[in-house]
């Protein structure tokens, strides 16, 4: 009888926190600056420089820990992780090994195939990021940008509770949404503000011992993570979609950790924890439940709208301004999602103002513009954030509500299409659809289809 094996997966997720300054100095954390412009003696490891802990980093770490059902260590310390690499100017990284800020938590995940389970959080610790190596193939050299050096990170270390790529993606999505809703990070994988190391082993089903662990590092997209789980202990190259041999998986002794002598322990009071807990915002699950009960949205719509914090914010602000939750949901679920797909954009990248969407919804409800024209206007809102009232006025898109003008146009259409008139009067109800279409075409889409239908039936009944 052949043996059955299972994959055992754990993750180390690195998240850049959304502080304005670095973890141990006052340098900016803004992404995209010119190389080596956001640096100082502290984050470049100059002799004699001393670190000062950023309080906001501690509070973000606590907030994430509480949202992930972790215990908060009320006495935590920083340690030096010693290694030599060009992007590490100090030759050590300030991290937390012995007393991390959070431990023993869990999050509940649900996969696309409907599997529900809890994934344990072993610990969350604070640390500083390294610089960035830039490889110049033309000059055959490597350059170092220290702007990222000292940017605050939390590392979320899971228990080895996942068994498939599907579960891993569900876990990462759960973490991403928790952290985004807390405002602790934007979790933009393409900018490196969320990265994952994947630890994989294989063992017999039912065995308690783990197999030899392998590690995939430098993975910053969910697609790449799914691919990487097929690999072994190597460094994932996203450009080549392959892995390459790296150093073996290190243990703590390889880094010669010791307590950082320049940083005092962090003492966290019960009152501080209570204040952070009280300030926790509504997270994705609670928001989704509220959308269903308060706005009477279908569960599917609530899931999609809350799957991006930015999308949820746009929805709520639009509803606040126009008071029409179902219409706001429909525009975002149908037209916005269509345009996002066409432009290959993420919902977090939508740049239009909720006020303009709310105004468009109100204009449709007031009969100032029909839905067909409104779709064209929404595209302009989506792409250029135009004011719909101004755009409609400039382009002459307002609905023609002049009954006399509509009747005159319809009479011309009836005169030009005697066969369709005869078909309708002969009992072919579908013939009126053709006549409505011809009228709308003649009016360049600026007529109210309902009024056109009503007037056509009145004139055909004569």
Model-found features: residue ranges?
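Small-residue helix-packing motif on alpha-helices
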Residues: 168, 302, 328, 374, ...
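Strongly charged, low-complexity linkers/loops
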Residues: 347-358, 362, 371-441
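Amphipathic alpha-helical core segments of compact helical bundles
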Residues: 18, 312, 316, 333-341, ...
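Core structural elements
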Residues: 191-204, 255, 292-314, 325-342, ...
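Basic, nucleic-acid-interacting segments
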Residues: 1-282, 299, 320-324, 334
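M16/insulysin-pitrilysin zinc metalloprotease superfamily fold
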Residues: 321-322, 328, 336-350, 359-364, ...
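Structural motif
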Residues: 3, 296, 319-328, 366-369, ...
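C-terminal non-catalytic interaction appendages of large macromolecular assemblies
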Residues: 3, 146-151, 189-196, 205-206, ...
